[in-house]
Amino acid sequence: MEECWVTEIANGSKDGLDSNPMKDYMILSGPQKTAVAVLCTLLGLLSALENVAVLYLILSSHQLRRKPSYLFIGSLAGADFLASVVFACSFVNFHVFHGVDSKAVFLLKIGSVTMTFTASVGSLLLTAIDRYLCLRYPPSYKALLTRGRALVTLGIMWVLSALVSYLPLMGWTCCPRPCSELFPLIPNDYLLSWLLFIAFLFSGIIYTYGHVLWKAHQHVASLSGHQDRQVPGMARMRLDVRLAKTLGLVLAVLLICWFPVLALMAHSLATTLSDQVKKAFAFCSMLCLINSMVNPVIYALRSGEIRSSAHHCLAHWKKCVRGLGSEAKEEAPRSSVTETEADGKITPWPDSRDLDLSDC
């Protein structure tokens, strides 16, 4: 297989780009290359910054990083950050600059892109399962899903994502057989296997979200039957309804961003694609990048504890900047004491519990 790849590249170098086997996948015109470069750079940079911010807020808070719910959200943010960086760089290098790497490097890049997006979907599935357990078994939730079990589950998910994604690098390639219409060196049988795996993850997400939304419906019915008297757990039930709406929103965004890409991948298995369809696939692929950009926005807006953590960080940085601006040496000790006292008085936003994603 290595000889096949080397021979094709060597022949391409002799006859020019027209004979390069990778040229069939480099189908963008000049204006389209510019559009892809601009969109990938902006979306990738914004997505990376957002996800880094979410990761920092979770890891810098002792309270958040001990909760399984936020471990799953942190895993999602980490996967989306890696996806933003790896996908944007690899996509622009290939489609805009026509960069051709060695077989091992190319398969490493495409495997890394596949792994990060697969881990992102896997993290969403674990988040959905976490919400289901919270709503289905509220009394025993904390004993059922401990921090240790959450970490073990995340480790298994990441290892499985890496194993599935790096199979082409381990030898499952198409050379010398015909490759996929959309991905160099990737055989159609591997693409079909990956599509089935992703379909399994999506099915799990939809099935779990369905139970979450049904549980929310039951809470609404319970609320309507106890309007005239105070019932313990009422606030929790209202919270669960909002959580269900949040998960429904995440699911809708996930399907909108992923369905076009997955549909074109499945279509490529059944027929030969024209250059127009390949160009459409290239632009639809950036919808996955948009999904990575939207995920932290949804969680930042919905999670009261993350917003409270951001409020603490901003207040702390603001006071640090003010402290650095103090020129009088005799004012330094008093300024430090004042800042410490002010930090101790900072309280979460009044509505932080209303949208808390992990209040189970």
Swiss-Prot record:
Resulting phenotype, D130A: Loss of ligand binding. Alters agonist-induced inhibitory effect on adenylate cyclase
Stretches for region Disordered: 327-360
Effect of S112G: Affects cannabinoid agonist binding
Sequence intervals crossing the membrane: 34-59, 72-92, 105-129, 150-172, 189-214, 247-267, 280-301
Biased composition (Basic and acidic residues): 351-360
GO cellular component, one term: perikaryon
Induction note: In macrophages, down-regulated by endocannabinoid anandamide/AEA.
Consequence when changing A244E: Loss of ligand binding. Alters agonist-induced inhibitory effect on adenylate cyclase
Tissue: Preferentially expressed in cells of the immune system with higher expression in B-cells and NK cells (at protein level). Expressed in skin in suprabasal layers and hair follicles (at protein level). Highly expressed in tonsil and to a lower extent in spleen, peripheral blood mononuclear cells, and thymus. PubMed:14657172 could not detect expression in normal brain. Expressed in brain by perivascular microglial cells and dorsal root ganglion sensory neurons (at protein level).
Effect of K109A: No effect on agonist binding. Affects cannabinoid agonist binding
Segments in the Cytoplasmic topological domain: 60-71, 130-149, 215-246, 302-360
Phosphothreonine: residues bearing it: T338
Phosphoserine modification, residue list: S335, S336, S352
A molecular-function term among this protein's GO annotations: cannabinoid receptor activity
Ranges per topology, Extracellular: 1-33, 93-104, 173-188, 268-279
Name of protein: Cannabinoid receptor 2
Annotated gene: CNR2
